[in-house]
Amino acid sequence: LMLSFLTLIGCSRSTPPEIDLTQIDQALQRTSNTTAPAPHSDIEAAAFERFTHFYNEYSADRIASNVRNLYAKDAFFADPYHLVQGIDSIEDYFIAMAAPAQSCTFEIGKIQRAENDFYCRWTMHLISNAAPDQPIIAQGLTHMRLNPAGKIIFHQDYWDTSVLLDRLPVVGFWTKLVKNRILKGMNHE
C-alpha cells in the first residue's frame, strides 16, 4: 500500500519511473485462472487477517517476519511508482520503503470479493523521519488475487500520488498550482 510514498521521502530519485502497463496486464493474465480460496472459508478469513495485521503496523521488522506468510513466491506487486516481481524483490522493496518512516499504519477497510478478485479501501497514516511534525494521511484502493493457499499472487495499489508530491519543496508548489487551477476552471463552468 502506498509504499512508494516512502521512496520520495527517503530516496534521491526525483521523478517516478514510467510504469509499463503491459507488465500489469501480463500479471493479471497470468493469475486470471488461479482459483482463490472458497468464499467465507477459513483460508480466506486467515488471508484477510494476515493482510490486515501486516499493514496495521508497517515496519521493517514486521515486513521481515511476515511478508513470506502473506505473499506467494512468485507474487507481483505494483503501485503508481514501482513494479516488483517475486517474493525476494517484494521484501527488499517493502523494507526499503519502510526505512524512512518514523511510523506508518494502515486502516484497512472491509475486503470485498468479486469472483477471484479482492478489493479494499485503506487509509495510510505516515510520519516520516524527514518531517515528523507533518503527518501525512492518504487514501487508496488495493486490488489483489490470492492462490488456493490464501497467499497474495497479485497486488496493485491505486492512490492519488499528489498527496506526497505536495510535500516536496519545488514539486509541491507546482502540483498545488495545477490542482488549484483545475478547481478554479471547474468552478467557472
Regions found by a protein language model. Name each.
Residues E18-T31, Q156-E189:
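Low-complexity, intrinsically disordered terminal/linker segments enriched in charged
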Residues S103-F106, I136-T142:
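Short, surface-exposed coil-to-beta transition loops
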